[in-house]
């Protein structure tokens, strides 16, 4: 089934382009049309890729994938209220958490 909305808008815009004499108006209309076409084609391509991926490749179940996905931590989209425990965990794990410059041995003869 063909969507007639883009065809209708193109016909309307072509008639406006023919009837207008100002360059700025025509350039504005042309830029809006090209933006609409680019956004629409990118959206339909993404939808097509998602549909073909979901229908052709079904996830296979095995113990490695399940354990890997269970143990894997997500490092994207961390909410603000969960950021403090992550930093506290990093404080105990890495050198900047337990680094004390006064506890290091002093070299003899160092000025």
UniProtKB/Swiss-Prot annotation:
Keyword Glycoprotein recorded: yes
Membrane-protein topology: Single-pass membrane protein
The keyword Metal-binding belongs to this UniProt entry's keyword annotation: no
Induction: Expressed in the late phase of the viral replicative cycle.
Glycan attachment points: 65
GO cellular component, one term: membrane
Keywords, alphabetical: Glycoprotein, Late protein, Membrane, Transmembrane, Transmembrane helix, Virion
Compartments it resides in: Virion membrane
Signal sequence bounds: none
Transmembrane segments: 10-32
Family: Belongs to the asfivirus H108R family.
Designated name of the protein: Inner membrane protein H108R
Species of origin: African swine fever virus (isolate Tick/Malawi/Lil 20-1/1983) (ASFV)
The organism's taxonomic lineage, starting at the top: Viruses, Varidnaviria, Bamfordvirae, Nucleocytoviricota, Pokkesviricetes
